[in-house]
């Protein structure tokens, strides 16, 4: 079976929750799954004063870790319609892996969180996907086989480009059952694809 890395950055825990759901879906296929986060770049005093969720259980990843997986699913909150600076700084350091073609042919996917419905979810997913395509990866999104993203009964995240959640302006809304199911579904599809390609 394949090895899957769920790599994320989360400020208040919303993306962390999606990451765990992505991992659950991937594990359901029999894949070996690790969840890791990128290093925090905000000074500890600022993070504490801003009420960042600093007690996240996932270990911190290194750029070299990326070479050890068949699939890499990347999640980050939106920062003004793009990926967070923490994730950007981490991916920018992967130039050596890119130069050697280490990530070519691996399976990739993206997920995100925004404060509002129209706060840049798809733009952020595209910016993650652009990185993964430059690395030579094959992208798996969240197709409409996840029926939840089509509901009109409640506000939900989700896009064909990846799982998403809407956190609210103060971070007061946690990922809904439908959004977590979308993340699980995407994780399952990514792992199934990697299992077919890498056994």
Swiss-Prot record:
Substrate binds at residue 98. NAD(+) binds at residue 12. Keywords: Flavoprotein, FMN, NAD, NADP, Nucleotide-binding, Oxidoreductase, Plasmid. Its cofactor is FMN. The keyword Oxidoreductase applies. This is NAD(P)H dehydrogenase (quinone). SUPFAM superfamilies: Flavoproteins. It comes from Cupriavidus metallidurans (strain ATCC 43123 / DSM 2839 / NBRC 102507 / CH34). GO terms for cellular component: membrane. Transmembrane segments: none annotated. GO terms for molecular function: flavin adenine dinucleotide binding; FMN binding; NAD binding; NADH:ubiquinone reductase (non-electrogenic) activity; NADP binding; NADPH dehydrogenase (quinone) activity. Its EC number is 1.6.5.2. Belongs to the WrbA family.
């Amino acid at each position: 079976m394949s090895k899957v890395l769920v790599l994320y950055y989360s400020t208040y825990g919303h993306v962390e929750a999606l990451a765990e759901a992505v991992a659950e879906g991937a594990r359901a296929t029999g894949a070996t799954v690790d969840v890791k986060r990128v290093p925090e770049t905000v000074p500890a005093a600022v993070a504490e004063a801003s009420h960042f969720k600093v007690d996240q259980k996932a270990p911190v990843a290194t750029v070299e870790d990326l070479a050890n997986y068949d699939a890499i699913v990347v999640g980050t909150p939106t920062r003004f319609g793009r990926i967070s600076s923490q994730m950007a700084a981490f991916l920018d350091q992967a130039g050596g892996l890119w130069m050697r073609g280490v990530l070519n042919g691996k399976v990739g996917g993206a997920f995100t969180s925004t404060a509002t419905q129209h706060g840049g979810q798809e733009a952020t997913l595209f910016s993650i996907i652009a990185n993964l395509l430059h690395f030579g990866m094959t992208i798996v999104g969240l197709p409409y086989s996840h029926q939840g993203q089509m509901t009109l009964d409640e506000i939900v995240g989700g896009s064909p480009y990846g799982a998403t959640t809407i956190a609210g302006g103060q971070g007061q809304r946690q990922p809904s059952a439908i959004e977590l199911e979308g993340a699980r579904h995407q994780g399952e599809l990514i792992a199934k694809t990697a299992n077919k390609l890498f056994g």
